Regions:
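C-terminal beta-strand-rich structural cap/linker in extracellular carbohydrate-active enzymes
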Residues: 174-175, 786-810
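Aromatic-rich carbohydrate-binding modules that target alpha-glucans
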Residues: 121-172, 178-207, 241-264
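Substrate-binding/active-site clefts of carbohydrate-active enzymes
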Residues: 305, 309, 317-503, 523-535, ...
Length: 810
């Protein structure tokens, strides 16, 4: 165990052992095996109290002893029933602590893991609010406290001035004041960010320690030896955490030697194949370098791990009409955008077999829900009360039958079989929150569902508050499961298992995650692993949809819950930077760094440019949204459907795709974005897919651009696993170096309307020599081959363009 200099002065406490009786009537059998997975580094500000939910990373099984060994400088209390670990850091503690965790089951060998705590120097920010004198209470709410409206009250200092000084982690922090129960932005602070509901939050940027611009990267990999370096070179660390992450999910400290400052060598000869090594370091003042991680063996297959996936979201009804015979007659009550339009599983299979996804560089398909939906249309609860069909698939009428209008069970089986032959994995959209009122399970087991009527007599419809977060219904015809009923949870988990077995699936996209209790997700993951060997495969992927801040999203993620979720907070900043150009690249870099810090290197988060619940990127890029005539983006889609009128909007889209495909994580493409499809809010963002074979002009240029990017991503492990260091972050220009073992890539952007020449310091990651540009968009671009001399490179970028450079082949 590596402890910082200050922490090493304290003797270890006696081992804290808690026997946990965790046999729950929810889902599990008495012989459930314990599970432990890799734990990302958890950053904790000094002199604060933090609670960590260990159920994200471990599942002890029905009865096991859990042991932790905290140093005396660290107050750690573990709740035996909830596995919540409360940590209190002392004022003089900073740096890195490796906290051993061990699960001792009644039978079998113990499982050991490492929880690395990064104790960052305390940095307080002073929030002030000037009132009118009549205010009785002013509180601060934000991502840092889970948007709790009462936990952080401000103090009245004098007159009408209220204040609160609060230690916050570095990065952008969204917040609002709650004044006598009313939510308000900070009128004295001009910086804001979209809150995901059409409104704004105030935003404050908490700077990192000025000495923290240090990054670690895996420099080389040889049999039995991994070498990591620092950028800048020669950086001196005072505390170190080096952890070996083994294929079975356990982890342990491993020794790293440092023959010179900024260089670390790790003997990996004792580790099993496919193990990973993660290195983290801090300076004497507690400043943390960005950690790095590398596999000890060379990658041999580009889809053997979750981080190798490139996902394409096929929204079935809006894809290709492969069999017109299964198309229903139009419903006269329903406007065309909400009708079934003919796309089906046969059409998606045809796209597989004609090589579209292979040419596009896709290796994973996310299919929208395939469950049979009701034959008739239904009226939406909210005004103006439009009628909709179940074309989207989110009104399950059956938990076993595939929608006949999509081709039925045979069509899905044929699709997954064909996908397997063509090297594609298939991830199915799974609806676990509700069923349709005509579903047999609702008729046979009404006790499995919550009530539509609240005790006060009001309807529990779309009430997103904490009190009704897990019980509210989306529509009166969509009964909501009650997860306090063990039989209901058992039904949902066993049904998910059957879908995988029947159709040879590779994972699930999970709908409405935050509206389902945490205890269910623990049971869901455990149930899949117990009943499905494939669920323990490193390529099996559970990805969720949660519209929350990063901390809220992360609370559902870990090897004992979901593998990742869609990164909507990063999406918001990506949109404002590259589509609307209301923020600069410095904000985008800060948001990306914030995601990396909160989620961690081990987490397979999914960045995106949009999905079926969000207006298309091009609707914002072309200026159709926000629409001053109609602030509601869905209504804008009905009244003023988007259209692309400016060629520059496609250039913005291509830059966004470059950013997406060079990020860490599992990038997701929403169908049609690769062809420049536009659209405002749902359902305008769900238009039929244009025929890719007929793509011309900007659409064809964009399609070719995306295909080039995806193939580059698959060819270069630095994109998928490597360190990421921004070497230029200005308003309109941006450059990033990524490094992994012997692989190096450079990504550069010019958002401005004028050509620019960038002089970049690319060392130490990229040595002197030649680099080749892989994205040459015009004759005005730089030469294909550029030279790095004395660690510097000059690159010319046309207006609104991006470039990727890789070392020239000898």
């Amino acid at each position: 165990m590596n402890l910082p200099a200050l922490a090493s002065r304290y003797p270890l406490r006696l081992t804290l052992t808690l026997s946990l009786l965790l046999l729950s009537p929810l889902t599990r059998a008495a012989d459930e095996a314990p599970q432990l997975g890799w734990i990302p580094i958890q950053t904790i500000p000094a002199e604060t109290s933090t609670t960590l939910d260990l159920t994200r990373w471990l599942s002890p099984g029905p009865a096991a002893a859990v042991q932790i060994n905290p140093p005396a400088s660290l107050s750690a209390q573990l709740d035996p029933s909830s596995l919540q670990l409360k940590i209190q850091t002392q004022p003089d503690l900073q740096g890195l602590i490796d906290l051993p965790i061990q699960i001792k089951p009644k039978k079998g060998e113990p499982l050991s893991g490492i929880l690395t705590l990064a104790i960052s120097p305390r940095s307080s920010h002073r929030f002030t609010f000037t009132g009118k004198g009549s205010e009785k209470s002013v509180c601060l709410a934000g991502a840092f406290n889970g948007w709790n409206a009462t936990s952080h009250p401000l103090t009245r200092e004098k007159g009408n001035l209220w204040f609160l000084s609060l230690p916050l982690p570095p990065g952008p922090q969204a917040y609002k004041f709650v004044v006598d129960g009313e939510w308000r932005i900070d009128s004295s602070h001009s910086l804001t960010i979209a809150d995901g509901t059409g409104q704004k939050n105030s935003l404050v940027k908490i700077p990192e320690n000025t000495n923290s611009a240090t990054f670690l990267y895996a420099d080389s990999r040889k049999p039995g030896l991994l070498t990591f370096l620092s950028a800048p070179a020669g950086w001196k660390s005072s505390s170190l955490s080096c952890v070996a992450e083994l294929p079975d999910g356990t982890s342990r400290p491993i020794h790293a030697t440092s023959p010179q400052p900024g260089r670390w060598e790790i003997d990996t000869s004792s580790l099993p194949p496919d193990s990973w090594v993660r290195l983290a370091a801090a300076s004497e003042d507690g400043t943390l370098a960005r950690p790095a991680r590398a596999r000890i063996t060379t990658e041999t297959k580009t889809d053997a791990y979750r981080l190798d996936h490139i996902i394409y979201f096929a929204f079935i009804d809006r894809m290709i009409d492969g069999d017109p015979k299964n198309n229903p007659a139009p419903d006269p009550k329903v406007e065309k955008p909400a009708q079934y339009l003919g796309g089906d599983l046969i059409g998606v299979r045809q796209m597989i077999e004609n090589g579209y996804f292979e040419k596009l560089g896709i290796n994973s398909l996310w299919l929208s829900p395939v469950n049979q939906n009701p034959p008739q249309s239904f009226q939406e609860y909210l005004p103006p009360g439009r009628w909709y069909t179940g074309y989207h698939g989110y009104w399950p009428l059956s938990s076993t039958e595939v929608e006949p209008r999509f081709g039925g069970n045979d069509a899905l089986e044929a699709l997954t079989t064909s996908a397997r032959k063509h090297g594609l994995r298939v991830i199915l959209d799974l609806v676990l929150a509700h069923v349709h009122e005509d579903h047999p399970v609702f008729k046979d087991h009404p006790d499995w569902f919550g009530s539509l009527t609240l005790p006060d007599g009001t309807k529990n419809l779309r009430k997103w508050d904490a009190e009704t977060q897990f019980t509210t219904w989306f529509e009166p015809f969509l009964p909501r499961f009650n997860y306090d009923q063990p039989a209901a949870s058992r039904f949902l988990i066993s049904n998910a298992v059957e879908w995988v077995k029947r159709f040879n699936l590779d994972g699930f996209r999970l709908d409405a995650v935050k509206h389902i209790p945490q205890k269910f997700w623990s049971a869901f993951r455990s149930g899949l692993r117990t009943d499905l060997p494939v669920a323990s495969d490193p390529a099996f992927y559970l990805v969720g949809e949660t519209f929350m801040n990063r901390q809220g999203i992360a609370s559902f993620v870990g090897p004992a819950k979901l593998d990742g979720q869609f990164d909507f907070p990063l999406y918001d900043t990506l949109l404002s930077t590259l589509a609307m150009e209301s923020t600069g690249f410095s904000e985008l870099e800060a948001a990306t760094a914030d995601s990396e810090r909160v989620y961690g290197l081990e987490t397979a988060m999914s960045p995106l440019l949009g999905n079926h619940d969000k207006p298309r990127f091009l609707a914002y890029a072309d200026g159709d949204l926000p629409d001053p005539r109609e602030p509601d983006e869905e209504e804008a889609g009905w009244k003023y459907p988007s259209a692309v009128n400016h060629p520059s909007s496609y250039a913005k889209l291509r830059m966004a795709f470059t950013f997406l495909m060079t990020l860490p994580g599992v990038p997701m493409i929403y169908y049609g974005d690769e062809l420049g499809l536009t659209g405002a809010g749902d359902p305008d963002n769900r238009r039929m897919l244009p025929d890719p074979d007929k793509a011309t002009g900007e659409a064809k240029t964009t399609l070719d651009h995306v295909s080039k990017l995806t193939h580059l991503r698959s060819a270069h492990p630095a994109f998928r696993y490597g360190s990421r260091r921004a070497i230029e972050t200005k308003k309109d220009t941006y450059a990033i170096v990524r490094a992994y073992a012997e692989d190096r890539v450079l990504i550069a952007f010019n958002r401005s309307e004028k050509p620019v020449s960038l002089d970049l310091l690319v060392s130490p990651e990229i040595p002197d020599g030649s680099l080749e540009q892989e994205l040459l968009l015009s004759k005005t671009s730089s030469a294909k081959t550029l030279s790095v001399k004395d660690g510097r490179l000059t690159i010319f970028l046309p207006p609104r363009s991006s470039s990727i450079l890789v070392p020239a082949k000898p």
